[in-house]
Amino acid sequence: MKLTPKELDKLMLHYAGELARKRKEKGIKLNYVEAVALISAHIMEEARAGKKTAAELMQEGRTLLKPDDVMDGVASMIHEVGIEAMFPDGTKLVTVHTPIEASGKLVPGELFLKNEDITINEGKKAVSVKVKNVGDRPVQIGSHFHFFEVNRCLDFDREKTFGKRLDIASGTAVRFEPGEEKSVELIDIGGSRRIFGFNALVDRQADNESKKIALHRAKERGFHGAKSDDNYVKTIKE
């Protein structure tokens, strides 16, 4: 008997599903893998029998297991189960959403938030900087990008922004349309303040000496708003 990799996978899934069913019958609470295998194997068998539609199996898949049939936390881990099943008229994807109803118990890793506003970057001193996009394309800056090194077509006092980032929620951004001018709030970058990457204007500890070097580099490379002493010469030792 020669089986394709897909057929071998289905055979393994059937075996896992049967094992899970037997354990369920013995009153053993199922883990994540066993729960998914039981639901998937049942759907495959019913689809092969050809007496139920894909829509019917989607609904039936939600009735196979109850919260008491699985270990604590498993129900909340399974948001959906998708299985490609063979029906008489061909292969169809059967997706069962929320296959196990919530038990009402605490979920591992669950967070309980206070019903009040959260103050971001509390206690950090912010500075306001006016920025203008003198380029012909929109520029979007992420919350933790070193603002000193943003797109060269943004014109602002770069020296004032050295070692700082946007004072906005993590993962959000500020967008500047072509020709747009607006003020943004900036705060100091935290941690060890070793700044690497971005536009490679710093690549070292963010201190007063590295600021002079970064301003010199920015001016040489055409970053708007970068002003440095033309007589300043510094040999960078790598």
Swiss-Prot record:
InterPro entries from the UniProt entry: Urease_beta-like (IPR002019), Urease_betasu_sf (IPR036461), Urease_gamma-beta_su (IPR008223), Urease_gamma/gamma-beta_su (IPR002026), Urease_gamma_sf (IPR036463), Urease_subunit (IPR050069)
Annotated signal sequence range: none
Reactions catalysed: urea + 2 H2O + H(+) = hydrogencarbonate + 2 NH4(+)
User: What biological-process terms (Gene Ontology) are attached?
Assistant: urea catabolic process
Q: What is its EC number?
A: 3.5.1.5
Assembly and interaction partners? Heterohexamer of 3 UreA (alpha) and 3 UreB (beta) subunits.
- List the NCBIfam families hit by this protein, alphabetically: PRK13192.1, PRK13203.1, PRK13241.1, PRK13986.1, urease_beta, urease_gam
The protein's name in its UniProt record: Urease subunit alpha
Name the source organism.
Helicobacter pylori (strain Shi470)
Tell me the lineage of the source organism.
Bacteria, Pseudomonadati, Campylobacterota, Epsilonproteobacteria, Campylobacterales
This chain is encoded by the gene named ureA
